[in-house]
Amino acid sequence: HIEDGVALTKFLYWIKTLKKLNLTEQKVEKKLENFRKQNKNYLYPSFDTIAGTGPNGAIIHYRSNKQSNRKINKNDLLLIDSGGQYKWGTTDVTRTICFSNVSKKIKELFTRVLKGHIAVAQCDIKKDQVGHNVDKKARQSLNKIGLDYRHGTGHGVGFFLNVHEGPQSISKNNYVKLEQGMVVSNEPGYYLENKFGIRIENLVFIKKNNNKLSFENLTFAPIDKDLIEKKMLNKKEVKWLNNYHRLVFKKLSKYMNKKELVLLKESCSNI
């Protein structure tokens, strides 16, 4: 997961510092794949990369083709859902990024998705708790304003096996008990048809701590702070985000060149 975080973070530096966004979705997919290929332990994608910009980002299981392959516009959000198969395991990560100032509404929606992501990450797993119970926490902030998303909050992930692997998941209809050692995704989102998509995804590991189960993050990559409305986050959420970014910097910084390190430091600074 650290190796995958290095590839994704180097890609994010590359795309964020381009002088001209002369790119299409398929070029983005190939470029990210090239960054992963630089690692000798990388074997192949764990699934077809989703790179959806603007309205294509609102298609939950989007796959680009010759007809849909959209140019990247600096005024649109870009949703990138990707993963790799490495000798040491399987990754799956989603980041949503922007290239210019965004509206207050988009910031609000992104922050509500982030609040859901943090709610799952901070969740204590009670005895015999099932995925259905955790799923509610992820949707709470969106539900407060009458919004939701049409997919599960998380799916099980195998170890150099299937990137979607049961029986565990975090979803409305899953009643499988969450147990120590399971890996699941944490990926709430929001999608406005024909406009944009937002998703934040990390993989998490269920660990035992003082006779309690909790989630430990496995994914290390910056979350775009330009999309966050800080005043919507409570103190615990701000602390979680700052601690997460501190850990991202600690895990990845030694693999960055000088220019990449400058952006990583800024991306991981406190809000």
Functional labels for PLM-detected ranges:
Residues 1-271:
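Active-site neighborhoods and metal-handling regions in enzymes and metal-associated proteins
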